[in-house]
């Protein structure tokens, strides 16, 4: 399926595009709210500025995808591969990203308030100045992730892996750190109360 066919079918009311192959597709600034692209291949796709609210991207492959300024509020990203994806300034409020992989993803200035990111892989991810207020990160791997200037107030960090994680100037107030080893974490100027 090519992008023209997908857009035509979407405009005609179709929402299910399970297992679609849209690698390298250009779908910038499009309204694709409530689309079902679960298990689809979207590696290197450009979805910058698109409206993907309530989209189902579960188990989809979005490796190196461009999602800059995209709106993914309340989307399902369970077990989605977003390794090395560009999510700068993306809206990810209320997403279900349980088990997703975001290795080396760029999430600078992203809005992740209230997201479920339990069991997520954020190894080497860049989350500088992101808003993660009230995020569920239980059991997540945050090794080598950079949270400089981010807001994690009220986040649940029970059982996370934090090897060489950077929390410089990060708001960590009212968070749960049960079963967390902080011995190899940079907490310079972090807000802990």
What are the functions of these language-model segments?
Residues 2-193:
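Tandem repeat scaffolds
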């Amino acid at each position: 399926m090519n992008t023209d066919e997908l857009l035509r079918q979407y405009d005609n009311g179709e929402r299910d595009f399970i297992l679609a192959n849209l690698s390298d597709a250009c779908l910038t600034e499009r309204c694709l709210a409530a689309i079902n692209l679960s298990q689809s291949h979207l590696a290197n796709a450009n979805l910058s500025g698109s409206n993907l609210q309530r989209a189902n991207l579960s188990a989809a492959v979005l490796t190196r995808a461009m999602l800059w300024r995209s709106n993914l509020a309340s989307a399902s990203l369970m077990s989605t591969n977003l390794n090395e994806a560009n999510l700068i300034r993306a809206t990810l409020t209320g997403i279900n990203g349980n088990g997703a992989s975001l290795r080396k993803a760029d999430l600078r200035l992203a809005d992740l308030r209230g997201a479920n990111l339990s069991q997520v892989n954020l190894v080497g991810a860049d989350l500088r100045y992101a808003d993660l207020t009230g995020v569920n990160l239980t059991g997540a791997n945050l090794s080598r992730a950079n949270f400089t200037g981010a807001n994690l107030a009220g986040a649940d960090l029970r059982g996370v892996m934090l090897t060489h994680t950077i929390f410089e100037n990060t708001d960590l107030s009212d968070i749960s750190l049960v079963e967390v080893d902080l011995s190899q974490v940079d907490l310079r100027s972090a807000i802990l109360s």
